Amino acid sequence: MAEIVEYIGTGRRKTSVARVRLRPGEGKFIVNGKELKDLKEYLHNDAWVRHALKPAVLTDTLGRFDIFIRVSGGGLSGQAGAIRLGIARALLQFNEDLKPLLKQNGLLTRDARIVERKKYGLKKARRAPQFSKR
C-alpha cells in the first residue's frame, strides 16, 4: 500500500488552536471534518479568509494541496490567525526553501498577544472604578 505523504503544522492565536495537515491533492478544504468549497464557508469573512490563506497564496501552493484543518477555541478572527500559522508551518515541512519568504512576511511568528486577566478591585484588566474626591 502506498504511504500517504502529509505535512503537519500547528498554529495558535489568542485562545484558538489549529492543527493543519496538507496532503497533495486538488485544493479541497476539510474543516473540523466537513468538506467545504472554500474557507469562506467556515470563516464567513473575506478578510479572515485572505488572512488565513496568505502563506499558501504567497508561496503559490494554494491548489496543490488538500487542506485538513481541526480548529477549536476562540472566535473566528483568532481561528483565522491560528490556521494561518498552521499552514505556514506545514508548508515549511513541505519545502524548507520557503523559510526566508515566509519569515520575511512575518508568517512564522506566533502572535503572543492574549487577553490580559481581570484584577480584583478593578472593573476590567486595567479600568479602575471611578474616583470621587469628596
Swiss-Prot record:
Taxonomic superkingdom: Bacteria
InterPro entries, alphabetized: Ribosomal_Su5_D2-typ_SF (IPR020568), Ribosomal_uS9 (IPR000754), Ribosomal_uS9_bac/plastid (IPR023035), Ribosomal_uS9_CS (IPR020574), Ribsml_uS5_D2-typ_fold_subgr (IPR014721)
GO molecular function, one term: RNA binding
GO CC entries: cytosolic small ribosomal subunit
PANTHER family: RIBOSOMAL PROTEIN S9 (PTHR21569), SMALL RIBOSOMAL SUBUNIT PROTEIN US9M (PTHR21569:SF1)
HAMAP family, sorted: Ribosomal_uS9_B (MF_00532_B)
Membership in a protein family: Belongs to the universal ribosomal protein uS9 family.
Protein name: Small ribosomal subunit protein uS9
Top-level taxonomy: Bacteria, Thermotogati, Thermotogota, Thermotogae, Kosmotogales
